[in-house]
Amino acid sequence: MLNTTATIDPQRGRRPAFRLHLYRSSAATRGLPTALALFMAYVAVELCIWLFCRDISDAVAFFPSNGVLVAALLLLSPRLGLAFCLACFGIDIVHNWIGRIDLTHALVFSSLNQALAIGAAALTRTFCGAALDLSRARRLVTFALIAAASAALEGMVGQILLGLLDGASNDVFHAWLQWTLEDGLGLLIATPAALLPFKQKRLFDVAGGARLERPLLLAITVALTVAAFAFDRFIAVTLVMPVLVLTAFRAGPGWVYGSVLTTSVIAMALTANGHGPIAFMAPTAPYRQEFMVQLFIASTFATAVPAAAALGARN
């Protein structure tokens, strides 16, 4: 367990370098009901990915499961968090095995997911404040850097391990970039989406919209995303963005993260199954498909989340 504090050097009168905290004794922790809710969310995400989101190369463009795992490590007690990690490790192994991945590679991928989640959780606990309010602009930027750096390091280690197992690859950079974006976007979007209902539930009701307006905006976003990625016309994709901005103004950060997460999964699933403008443009190029889906996901995040953070700071 990472849990240390900085002390003042009496001879020099200054603090030494920071140290990471995965757990703080003063931090409030959640119990079994929260663990069960997060575990059900983790299983649901894994099942959705397995059933709907794998492309022709058996890969995915966006992996939000690790974000749920990070949220659990930040919310649960050390003992419950360890049990949660072990349970998710088992689910991940089964997921990879069902996906026709041999046991050695399944262990590598699942272990890297665990390491990524633990590292990202420790960095988030250390640098994003005790309240873990990732809806605030400054903490959101900090967390975005944490997600990007953690995923980039995990992708690099993963490519090295795959090189040792399978031999040198002819496309290491694109494989590393896809891995980094897949897990980085998963952390960036899914971690706040999983944290907000437990840490800042009020952020689901802070905007000026009526109670019925919020789920209605989510339903419109889902419908537009399905329509945009069910047909081969790129212009329809642009219709999603104004609704996400409207959600930021009328529904608040909680609904924004839920909308971005839902939009991302729908876009990934339909593209992976050969539907929509991205699949039409690159029907046999999985890296290109994945990168364009990742670009769309990043665009939806950049369109709505900073606006919600700015409005939250103003309010």
PLM-predicted stretches and their roles:
Residues 172-186, 285-295:
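Short aromatic-rich membrane-water interface segments that cap or initiate transmembrane helices
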